[in-house]
Amino acid sequence: MAALPAETRPLLAVLRGERRDPPPVWLMRQAGRYLPEYRALRETKGGFLELAYDSDAAAEITLQPIRRFGFDGAILFSDILIIPHAMGQDLRFEAGEGPRLSPTLVDRTLADLEPVPARLEPIYGTVRRVRAALPAETTFLGFAGSPWTVATYMVAGQGSREQAETRRKAYRDPAGFQAIIDALVDATADYLSKQIEAGVDAVQLFDSWAGSLAPREFERWVIAPTAQLVRRLHARHPGVPVIGFPKGAGGKLPAYARETGVDAVGLDETVDPAWAHANLPEGLTVQGNLDPLALVSGGEGLDTAVDAILGAFPGRPHVFNLGHGILLDTPIAHVERLLARVRG
């Protein structure tokens, strides 16, 4: 289905710096386990990776929340660790424990891995299928993990709140760790570029572990590589917005916004929207930042939280979203209530 011009696609227009009232809405992890149609499909297909690498299944999952809720944006169903899988690490998902990568890069280098770039091809197939089926007014978002966050998994093999293993490697072997970051900048730029060529309208960089770094390290391992990525994507694809989501960055958000060149900044639920409005560059699009637990809880508490966010960004382009991914136990009715509240 042919996409409409940006001015008739609310989300794309706002990501390009326009303000719309009401703001466009999409939710991180909007395609997933809280939806009964997702659970039914997963029962027929096996594990998460089997779904992610099945272009037909992944396209269907991407489209499910659009059909049910009419979100203004569809986000590709995939995972941030697809890139290290293509770079030669083994990727598996352990029930109740999250993703695991091996061999780890604690004492190894990228030269020890054997890349398998063909692993990325089904992702581009998913993009093409979604693009063909997506409603014309809906913006299509691609995504990747940011280099720092992906590197934490490549080094330690799994996520952890403090990322101690990866931070130790960065302190002890900064040149070796820089090589990992540089390789991820290259791989991520190519990956997102091919998503754009296949049909996405904008892309988001998920930096889930950005909050684990001290200011100087944040500058080197989050801001600098993100800025490189954004420059490359803007040069290759003028007019395609890039959203940066440095979860946990807190007081480092203004520097991130100024120095990376992203077109929009995602706010996690710990950020005071009024503070963000006062301290982020004027006119920069912001995205967020409802607490996912407020959505789970519902009721008047949800209404109050939604209203506070809607009133926090006078005159600023705003995309309504969560502060992190939607939770498994989120009732469908609460998502419907959220949309009704935002859209009036």
UniProtKB/Swiss-Prot annotation:
Function of the protein: Catalyzes the decarboxylation of four acetate groups of uroporphyrinogen-III to yield coproporphyrinogen-III.
Gene: hemE
Subunit structure: Homodimer.
Sample GO molecular function, one term: uroporphyrinogen decarboxylase activity
Family, similarity comment: Belongs to the uroporphyrinogen decarboxylase family.
Highest classification ranks of the organism: Bacteria, Pseudomonadati, Pseudomonadota, Alphaproteobacteria, Sphingomonadales
Protein species of origin: Rhizorhabdus wittichii (strain DSM 6014 / CCUG 31198 / JCM 15750 / NBRC 105917 / EY 4224 / RW1) (Sphingomonas wittichii)
Binding residues annotated for substrate, in chain numbering: R29, Q30, A31, G32, R33, D79, Y153, S208, H324
Record's protein name: Uroporphyrinogen decarboxylase
Site description Transition state stabilizer, residues in chain: D79
EC numbers, comma separated: 4.1.1.37
Any one annotated GO CC term: cytosol
